[in-house]
């Protein structure tokens, strides 16, 4: 019997030890240091092509990721979870968070030096210590947080989704034209008067952040003649646009060989109001078509009237969900944009398909698809884009299905909105 008791005690000891070494989130010492299990579902902004040609190569890449746990408004934990994310499936992974009976909030910080943080800091002070410098960034700083939990316990499960937001704004000029390069050559843009630094976590604008007078960026050529698309874009820190600090974009180009400058101000509608602030995680797009006159000297462009009206170009503000709208056409008031004006069908046997994304700020009329040949169908339909207000507009996704038994060559159809008629070319596999 005594021998049997020893065996039982040994088995209990082994079982207890095994429960400690196999539980990677628990702690078998005391209840005070026990960890709760939190499942994080991380939503990272999709890559937006073309990538900005200033420093950051891919604005969705996560090179480092840290979890911040706040308890009752105080930073309680800082955990490097980069490897967990990199080994995760579809952005879902477990993290260990200490149990607490207080108010607990979790935050994720991507691609940011967190060495300025220390436990015990107040939340506002901690977040305000996370500052980036916009110049020469390799990876996009991002931030997201959860709702607060009324206590957190290992006796409960937590399935939490965190949306990471980019900490910078993007300014972009799209040149979509049928002009030859000898008629107009797009050389570069200069984004004027933006802040050099910003808060990673959206705490406003650092008071000590200096102004960068000029950021020069050459365009990326996406398509050549006869239908040219060249895009130049730059990531910038959040900046107020007002009389004391006017944000503009200079375009440098050659009109029939003569180099000159054109200035675009942040005019947003009908040549009157201007955007009052560049905001993180938003994209500000100027769409240019044919350039039909010579530019000025740089100083004349800076001191004279803006070229928005002559170019018929106002700035369009796109949210993160809208920023994959890459090909935009404007009239004197509205814009109509698509993800691409050339659709390459995926080979799926007889029925091939492609996905078209459409966005317009003409939400009262919406958009229509017209003049498609027989053998082409659209799902969910050929009309859409209506909303109750500009704030409620959404990107429409339309699947294009082609019966290659009927359609045997490349073809065009059109997307219209108001006075705008946009050609969409579909190429067979």
Model-derived segments and spans:
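Bacterial N-terminal signal peptides that target proteins for export
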Residues: 1-8
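C-terminal motif of bacterial Sec signal peptides marking the signal peptidase cleavage site
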Residues: 16-19
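Bacterial signal peptide processing site
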Residues: 21-24
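Tryptophan-paired
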Residues: 50-121, 172-280, 340-358, 401-404, ...
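Extracellular beta-sheet/turn segments enriched in Thr/Pro/Gly and aliphatic residues
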Residues: 128-166, 174-176, 271-327, 429
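C-terminal edge beta-strand
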Residues: 264-266, 419-429
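Surface-exposed binding patches on compact interaction domains or structured appendages
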Residues: 338-340, 351-395
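Extracellular/luminal low-complexity segments enriched in Ser/Thr/Pro
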Residues: 385-412
